[in-house]
């Protein structure tokens, strides 16, 4: 990197970074999670047409995915999101024979971030209540140390052990664990209802989803920002996390619905 840059370039870099981060951070993985649940439906449905239960083959594929996640994480100190998907994917195996209504209700419950609200409510009854210390900061500090040390084998071993553990624990603390489960189930529900199939009623559904999500995003984002200014770190990490997940989910729906609708245009 150059030691110094013109002021205009610094401003441009910051603008591009902030715009890209706002557009994709927390949304790219959410779209990936939706499609993960959707592709589970496709594979499960195809096997069901043959009179077979896809569940156990899916578990085997998750074992293979865990191996791939480990290989990928070996060269990436921050851990690999695929391992989170492997762990959370068990929910798809469990609900694969549930009714559409049960899957939708469960997806909504997961998306409400019940763990964060549990911790917040507990703090209301007990002012001395504290959140469980997952020690994520210390783990990532240790990851940084062996990365800077430059020992190749320590780097590989640390990444597939401590790095992966830190990544999973961060996902739990950041509210992504249950949100991922909810997104998987929403993707499965979308598949079952064939909402990606082009019909007039489905296009109306995505238009309504786009409007509702777009209207919801601004107040959710504003509330999240206000909550994050609280002097209480517990409120930031509970209520703040819940609203952060919700505003990101709303924007994710904006992106997905926009793509579905634009895909129908010849110009697109």
Residue ranges of each PLM-predicted region?
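Membrane-embedded alpha-helical segments of multi-pass membrane proteins
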Residues: 28-35, 78-90, 178-185, 242, ...
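Juxtamembrane membrane-water interface segments that cap and precede transmembrane helices
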Residues: 8-20, 152-169, 230-238
């Amino acid at each position: 990197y150059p030691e110094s840059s013109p002021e205009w370039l610094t401003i441009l870099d910051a603008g591009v970074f902030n715009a890209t981060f706002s557009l994709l951070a927390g949304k790219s993985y959410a779209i990936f999670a939706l499609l993960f649940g959707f592709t589970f439906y496709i594979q499960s449905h195809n096997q069901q047409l043959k009179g077979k239960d896809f569940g156990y083959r899916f578990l085997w594929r998750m074992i293979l995915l865990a191996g791939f996640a480990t290989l990928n994480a070996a060269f990436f100190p921050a851990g690999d999101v695929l391992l989170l998907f492997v762990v959370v994917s068990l929910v798809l195996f469990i609900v694969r024979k549930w009714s559409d209504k049960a899957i939708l209700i469960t997806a909504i419950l997961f998306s409400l971030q019940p763990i964060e609200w549990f911790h917040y409510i507990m703090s209301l009854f007990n002012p001395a209540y504290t959140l469980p210390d997952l020690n994520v900061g210390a783990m990532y500090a240790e990851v940084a140390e062996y990365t800077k040390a430059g020992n190749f084998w320590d780097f590989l071993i640390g990444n597939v052990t401590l790095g992966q553990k830190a990544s999973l624990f961060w996902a739990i603390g950041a509210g992504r664990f249950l949100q991922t489960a909810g997104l998987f189930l929403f993707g499965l529900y979308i598949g079952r209802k064939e909402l990606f199939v082009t019909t007039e009623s489905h296009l109306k559904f995505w238009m309504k989803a786009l409007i509702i999500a777009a209207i919801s995003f601004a107040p959710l984002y504003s509330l999240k920002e206000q909550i994050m200014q609280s002097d209480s770190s517990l409120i930031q990490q509970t209520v703040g996390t819940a609203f952060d997940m919700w505003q990101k989910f709303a924007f994710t729906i904006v992106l997905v619905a926009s793509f579905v609708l634009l895909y129908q245009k010849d110009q697109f």
